[in-house]
């Protein structure tokens, strides 16, 4: 499984529930994604200065991840509206992207 992870803080003045509901509108339109999860820092507990929200998107293959990104770029199903919405809700200075995989690889 390939896990594309985004950490971000919501912009000041933006309601967290509004952010999450808008993120779900975007994520629900990614047809090649296996599943996703949105989590929020609990009680400020963390070992380093990571942003408050974490979004994990799971893809069965790198091709599925690439197809999802192509889906956004091609604006299929007017997905760019929700993607732009994501960028409007988060503090751009805090966005961090990661790509993880299950290890060891499955044959």
Annotate each PLM feature.
Residues 1-2, 46-49:
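Short, flexible turn/loop "capping" segments at secondary-structure junctions
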Residues 51-53:
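Residues on conserved beta-strands of the protein kinase catalytic domain
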Residues 9-19:
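Short, surface-exposed ligand-recognition loops at beta-strand->loop->(often short) alpha-helix junctions
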Residues 28-35, 48-49, 58-97, 105:
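An amphipathic, aromatic/His-enriched active-site/gating alpha helix that lines ligand/cofactor pockets
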Residues 39-45:
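Short, solvent-exposed loop/turn elements at beta->coil junctions and helix N-caps
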Residues 6, 55-57:
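Conserved RNP beta-strands of RNA recognition motif
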Residues 1-9:
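Active-site-flanking beta-strand signature of metal-NTP-handling nucleotidyl enzymes
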């Amino acid at each position: 499984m390939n896990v594309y992870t985004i950490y971000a803080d919501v912009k000041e003045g933006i309601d967290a529930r509004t952010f999450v509901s808008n993120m779900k509108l975007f994520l629900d339109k990614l047809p090649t994604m296996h599943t996703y999860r949105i989590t929020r820092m609990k009680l400020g507990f963390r070992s380093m200065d990571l942003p408050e929200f974490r979004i994990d998107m799971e893809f069965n293959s790198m091709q599925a991840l690439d197809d999802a990104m192509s889906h956004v770029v091609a604006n299929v199903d007017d997905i760019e509206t929700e993607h732009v919405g994501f960028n409007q809700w988060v503090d751009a200075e805090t966005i961090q992207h990661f790509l993880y995989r299950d290890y060891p690889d499955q044959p």
